[in-house]
Amino acid sequence: MASAAAGASICIKSASFSPLAPGRISSLRSVSLPVSRKSFPSLKSSKSSFALRVSCQAKPETVAKVCGIVKKQLALPDDSEVNGLSKFSALGADSLDTVEIVMGLEEEFGISVEEESAQSIQTVQDAADLIEKLMEKKGH
């Protein structure tokens, strides 16, 4: 979320909320905190709005599996560097390649990715985060 003059807020979205004890949350995926410009004096002179995105990242093993699938689908050499920050477009993927990558991910992880969600995937990390979100919904 963003705000221009009076203040701003930090928003982290969540799929589930399970209280364990006062002040503790299990499977935290969302927190919204108001932020005063007084807390950040350097922002007082800024006329533009700002946003801070904090996301919970997928497990390293999920990212590694996605990297492997991306390399396979794009027929990249084994020594190609593919990591969470790798953009599909930078790896040479076109829209058809991206569809094939998503199909490979669906098969590997036993999930179904809706078209709208598939279109939002731009990086390996995006794909891994979406996979974990879908698997969590599925109960894995």
From Swiss-Prot:
Gene3D superfamilies: ACP-like. Residues 1-56 form a transit peptide. It comes from Cuphea lanceolata (Cigar flower). Pathway: Lipid metabolism; fatty acid biosynthesis. The keyword DNA repair does not apply. The gene is ACL1.1. One of its GO terms (cellular component) is chloroplast. SUPFAM superfamilies: ACP-like (SSF47336). This is Acyl carrier protein 1, chloroplastic. The lineage of its organism: Eukaryota, Viridiplantae, Streptophyta, Embryophyta, Tracheophyta. The modification O-(pantetheine 4'-phosphoryl)serine is found at residue 95. GO terms for molecular function: acyl carrier activity. Carrier of the growing fatty acid chain in fatty acid biosynthesis. Keywords: Chloroplast, Fatty acid biosynthesis, Fatty acid metabolism, Lipid biosynthesis, Lipid metabolism, Phosphopantetheine, Phosphoprotein, Plastid, Transit peptide.
